[in-house]
């Protein structure tokens, strides 16, 4: 019995490593969407109208974050070992600035889109909730 338990645990560990990171990100995105919708306490009709806009928002934020994420992955070993070159540091800094500017542009644009479905107060709260970090 114990032997079977170890085999099952081992297989689950292997399968969890085989799950593509995009699937994990999608799960994280779904959790964030649920968090925002739950905390806004919207009615069913409003949720039905707002959810697609919220999904688009998270897709655009992910698109803006993707280049920096790829660059950080590329330089991960050098960053962790404290051996980044000056050029790499500059690239990482510039990518962070570009990401933050892109996120600001997306948030500003979607605040306006959110207000087409939600009240101004709800749109403000939605943007605030979208920026919360989930554990």
Task: List the predicted regions and their residue ranges.
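Bacterial N-terminal signal peptides that target proteins for export
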Residues: 1-9
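Short, low-structural-confidence N-terminal segments
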Residues: 3, 14, 23-25
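Short linear motifs in intrinsically disordered/low-complexity regions
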Residues: 4-5, 17, 91
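Bacterial N-terminal signal peptides
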Residues: 8-18
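Charge-rich (acidic/polar
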Residues: 23-135
């Amino acid at each position: 019995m114990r032997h079977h338990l170890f085999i099952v645990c081992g297989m689950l560990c292997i399968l969890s490593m085989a799950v593509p990171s995009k699937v994990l990100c999608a799960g994280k995105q779904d959790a964030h969407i649920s968090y925002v919708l739950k905390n806004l306490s919207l009615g069913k009709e409003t949720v039905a109208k707002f959810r697609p806009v919220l999904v688009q928002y998270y897709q655009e934020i992910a698109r803006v974050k993707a280049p920096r994420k790829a660059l950080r992955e590329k330089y991960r070993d050098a960053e962790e070992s404290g051996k980044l070159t000056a050029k790499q540091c500059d690239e990482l800094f510039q990518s962070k600035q570009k990401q933050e500017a892109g996120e600001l542009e997306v948030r500003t644009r979607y605040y306006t889109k959110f207000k087409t479905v939600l009240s101004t107060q709800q749109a403000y709260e939605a943007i605030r909730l979208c920026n919360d970090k989930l554990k």
